[in-house]
Regions:
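Mature extracytoplasmic enzyme cores
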Residues: 12-18, 55, 79, 83-89, ...
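Membrane-interface starts of transmembrane alpha-helices
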Residues: 9, 13, 95-104, 126-133, ...
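Hydrophobic residues in alpha-helical segments
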Residues: 55-57, 171-172, 215-221, 294
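Polar, glycine-rich mid-to-C-terminal structural blocks
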Residues: 229-286, 297
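Transmembrane helix-loop junctions in multipass membrane proteins, especially transporters and channels
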Residues: 26, 30-34, 174, 195, ...
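Start-transfer (signal-anchor) and selected internal transmembrane alpha helices
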Residues: 1-27, 224-237
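Membrane-embedded helix bundles of polyisoprenyl
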Residues: 113-122, 128-217, 229, 233-251
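Membrane-interface coil-to-helix junctions
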Residues: 21-113, 135-158, 271-340
Length: 340
């Protein structure tokens, strides 16, 4: 018993430490009941008003709402994230968020940190290095910005990526049972969180991972282990996806009727192919913008912040020197701190 406790106590201490750190990092939320003005969360609550009202009055969920885009399936914007076999995933999900809920900054910071810590343990790092990596990952500039804006589902899926990769690594280390179980669990949680875009990107990462480790294992005469592990990986992924299949299939069916599929409106006998590339990638990072993950404000700053907001700035003095308020107001829009 002492031996077992001696092995697990550092990890219990780390979990407790990360929880305390997350609570203190967002102390105003936890001690003063203050709330971050997460714009996306507020927008979501507004979109869900009709659905929540119906649920409160009728005691059951409504499957359609008229409040969005002249009508759409309600499960696209509210609920519908669980499935019949979700007891264990829900328990893990809740534990990773300190039971505070997915929109809580504290819970999201803890989830990101503990997820990376689990991956580091799967790669057999000492708990001290794993803790350092967990803190660095959790405090990534991108995560703090995403949490502040309210991209909570995206952050939660990103928090689940490291343990999914760690579970895959266990499979290729010959730990078939544990690796399969964890892979199925974390894939399940990813899909259940309902941000398919990030899970789609993860699929590419997983493919490169398998190809890379496959080349190494074949060269080192571990082809049999590689084949078994890859087969179990595929089976585990299927097991993780299957409980969420109703949600995925209905989303696929619905997407074909939106601007993300081919348009039903014809012009000059031609059918449009949905949204154009510039619109689809309008909020995606360019190559240089990706460097903001490592160097904050490398391209200036947020596009909604302007140099003229500082009354002592050179920009403000230059506009005041114009002695033309209309021209100054027009030029003020060109003083955005973002220049990417």
């Amino acid at each position: 018993m002492k031996q077992i406790f001696g092995k697990i106590w550092p990890h219990l201490a780390v979990i407790l430490g990360l929880a305390i750190f997350s609570i203190f990092y967002f102390l105003p939320e936890n001690a003063e009941n203050k709330v971050l003005p997460q714009s996306d969360v507020q927008h979501s609550l507004s979109m869900q008003t009709e659905i929540r009202k119906y649920q409160a009055e009728e005691g059951r969920e409504i499957l359609w709402t008229n409040s969005m885009f002249s009508g759409m399936p309600s499960f696209q914007i509210y609920g519908g994230g669980g499935h019949t076999f979700d007891f264990v995933p829900r328990f893990v999900y809740s534990a990773m968020q300190l039971t505070k809920g997915i929109s809580s900054p504290t819970g999201l910071l803890f989830a990101c940190s503990i997820g990376f810590y689990l991956m580091m343990l799967c790669f057999r790092f000492n708990w001290k290095y794993a803790l350092a990596g967990a803190l660095l990952f959790g405090l990534s500039t991108s995560f703090i910005h995403l949490i502040g804006t309210g991209h909570v589902n995206k952050v939660m899926v990103l928090a689940l990526l490291p343990p999914t990769i760690g579970a895959m690594w266990l499979l290729y280390q010959g730990k078939y049972l544990l690796g399969s179980a964890l892979t199925a669990l974390f894939v399940n949680l990813q899909i259940m969180t309902n941000h398919p875009q990030i899970s789609f990107y993860y699929a590419f990462l997983a493919a490169f991972f398998v190809i890379g480790i496959g080349i190494h294992m074949i060269r080192t005469k571990q082809a049999r282990t590689f084949i078994i592990a890859t087969g179990l990986l595929g089976a585990s992924a299927i097991v993780g996806v299957l409980p969420n299949l109703p949600k995925l299939l209905t989303t696929k069916e619905y997407s074909e009727e939106t601007t993300r599929g081919a348009s039903l409106i014809t012009k000059d006998g031609k059918v449009a192919q949905g949204m154009d590339k510039e619109y689809a990638f309008g909020w995606s990072l360019s190559v240089m913008e990706s460097m903001t993950h490592f160097i904050p404000n490398i391209l200036g700053g947020p596009s909604n912040e302007f140099f003229v907001q500082d009354e002592n700035s050179n920009s403000m003095r230059a506009l005041q020197a114009l002695n033309n308020s209309d021209q100054a107001n027009q030029l003020a829009q060109a003083t955005s701190k973002y220049f990417g």
